[in-house]
Amino acid sequence: MNHPDFPPIGDPQLKLEALTHRSYCNEHPGTPSYDRLEFLGDAVLGFVVGRILFERYPHFTEAELTRLRSQLVNQNQLAYLARFLHIAPEIRLSQSLARDDGQSSPSILADVFESLLGAALLDRGLTAVEDFIQELFVPILEQWEKSQDGRSPKLVPTMDVKSMLQQWALAKTKQLPEYELINTSGPPHAQEFTFTVKVAGKIHGQGSGPSKQIATKQAALEALKSLGLLQ
């Protein structure tokens, strides 16, 4: 899935603030962190996504709308989007947190996604932020709708975990993940497949499912969790 570009933030100081983790501020006293902008971004994201869902699904109950919104904007989903928008390299962290690969932390990535939304709101206005959120989340909903019965939100909108793992592996090791079928069980009409996934020769995840596609996705998901990229 292609993602739109983040609204450009013309004020360089505002953008720097949106990218600054509080650990960086401990080493650079007087530097503002992204916490206040994250608060603002969280509020506008919840509002805009809530309105999208309200208008798109008039037959959903309040509880269903609330559940779907929480699935769309949870930490893992926002961290996934932040990675594909290439936000991580710009985040300012303390030296120790940077050495520990803090830019890959799902919580930090999700926080910075929201803080940049807050900065964009102040710099570009509500319309630009609304347009960006629409462009970002409506395709996710359209993909999700294809697997639904049109009556209730039964499934979480899924992230492309295999693409996420591939991007991480290429960035860190310059190698593609390797999936290996290690077991097939069950009768021909109800088979169960089990795959492992390796990165740079090391097994990081294993998954099973009724199809090879589902099994490899599960393996990728487990690998992302073991690497600390998802929680």
UniProtKB/Swiss-Prot annotation:
Mg(2+) binds at E38, D111, E114. Residues 160-229 form the DRBM domain. This is Ribonuclease 3 1. It comes from the Bacteria. Homodimer. One of its GO terms (cellular component) is cytosol. Its main location: cytoplasm. GO terms for biological process: mRNA processing; regulation of gene expression; RNA processing; rRNA processing; tRNA processing. Its EC number is 3.1.26.3. It is found in: Cytoplasm. The active site is at D42, E114. Residues 1-125 form the RNase III domain. Keywords: Cytoplasm, Endonuclease, Hydrolase, Magnesium, Metal-binding, mRNA processing, Nuclease, RNA-binding, rRNA processing, rRNA-binding, tRNA processing. GO terms for molecular function: double-stranded RNA binding; metal ion binding; ribonuclease III activity; rRNA binding. It catalyses: Endonucleolytic cleavage to 5'-phosphomonoester. Its cofactor is Mg(2+). Belongs to the ribonuclease III family. SUPFAM superfamilies: dsRNA-binding domain-like (SSF54768), RNase III domain-like (SSF69065).
